[in-house]
Amino acid sequence: MGRMRGEALAQEVLRLKRERNAVILAHSYQLPEVQEVADFVGDSLGLAREAQRTRAEVIVFCGVHFMAETAAILNPEKTVLLPDLEAGCSLADSIRPEDVLAWKAKHPDGIVVAYVNTKAEVKALADVCVTSANAVEVVSRLPQDRPIYFVPDMFLGAHVARVTGRRLDLFPGECHVHAGIREEHLKALLEAHPGAEFLIHPECGCGSGCLYLKPDAKMLSTEGMVRYAKGAEAREFVVATEVGILHRLKKEAPEKAFFPVKPDAVCEYMKRITLEKVYLSLKEMRHVVRVPEEVAGRARRALEAMVAVG
């Protein structure tokens, strides 16, 4: 995309947005040029809340499919557009409704906690949904005497179990990007930047190993990372998550330096959303995300419980 072309396209997107009474919501892993035209950039929890709060008639969701589904479930009266319907999620794809039903059959009094990175059909079977920003708080409030099934991210689940001291049954799912971030990637960076603070996303595969290397690591959601980096005294940060967050970190804390643990930790699904696709989506009102009401109605309860916490 040439410079003029990029700027002209961005102007067209903003013009169409006004014309359609639309709001553009973007996840922190989106391409920088997509983040720049968004009305709000944030994590799953912030985006879900913003979708609930908006007065716009149209929500253009620059993220992956389950996020647009979440916005559609929370706003049945609004039009939700996903600029590329192929923007999926390996973690959300890892679990099926049958997996949850099988566990429920064995644990009729059990509680199913679904990470927001799941399809609507799985959320519909959950008692509560969580994001990485509020999973610890939600789980710590659950009744002590009932079994809990945490799906689908086993690394986030292990982190929640570690912090809350609760015994959780974990589904063996993972995000392929975060699971690929390992201790060996971290070691060299920490040696090169001995004074740097270490920010790690709880989906990372190296959770316990990385904490062993750097016991004072901060395990945070993407929003938590931005908030922490802005307020911390440290000038250098080593960051373990998808690299799209670096644009936002540098923008919101320009005087600080950020080093990705794995510079090629890129979610190809997130990067499917381009400025051109945002433009076409708004221009033609294409790629509307709809969730059948019999699924949405059940999933809505679990999502509303999530949005209320943290």
Curated annotation (Swiss-Prot):
Gene Ontology, cellular component aspect: cytoplasm
GO biological process: one example: 'de novo' NAD biosynthetic process from L-aspartate
HAMAP family referenced in this protein's UniProt entry, alphabetically: NadA_type2 (MF_00568)
Domain of life: Bacteria
Function (record text): Catalyzes the condensation of iminoaspartate with dihydroxyacetone phosphate to form quinolinate.
Residues annotated to bind [4Fe-4S] cluster: 89, 175, 267
Keyword presence, Metal-binding: yes
Enzyme Commission code: 2.5.1.72
Family note: Belongs to the quinolinate synthase family. Type 2 subfamily.
Organism: Thermus thermophilus (strain ATCC 27634 / DSM 579 / HB8)
Catalysed reaction equations from the record: iminosuccinate + dihydroxyacetone phosphate = quinolinate + phosphate + 2 H2O + H(+)
GO function terms (MF aspect): 4 iron, 4 sulfur cluster binding; metal ion binding; quinolinate synthetase A activity
Protein's name according to its UniProt entry: Quinolinate synthase
Entries under InterPro entries matching the protein: NadA, NadA_sf, Quinolinate_synth_type2
Pathway: Cofactor biosynthesis; NAD(+) biosynthesis; quinolinate from iminoaspartate: step 1/1
Taxonomic classification: Bacteria, Thermotogati, Deinococcota, Deinococci, Thermales
Principal EC category: transferase
Record's subcellular location: Cytoplasm
Name of the encoding gene: nadA
Alphabetically ordered keywords of this record: 4Fe-4S, Cytoplasm, Iron, Iron-sulfur, Metal-binding, Pyridine nucleotide biosynthesis, Transferase
Note on how the cofactor is bound: Binds 1 [4Fe-4S] cluster per subunit.
Names of required cofactors: [4Fe-4S] cluster
Major site of localization recorded for this protein: cytoplasm
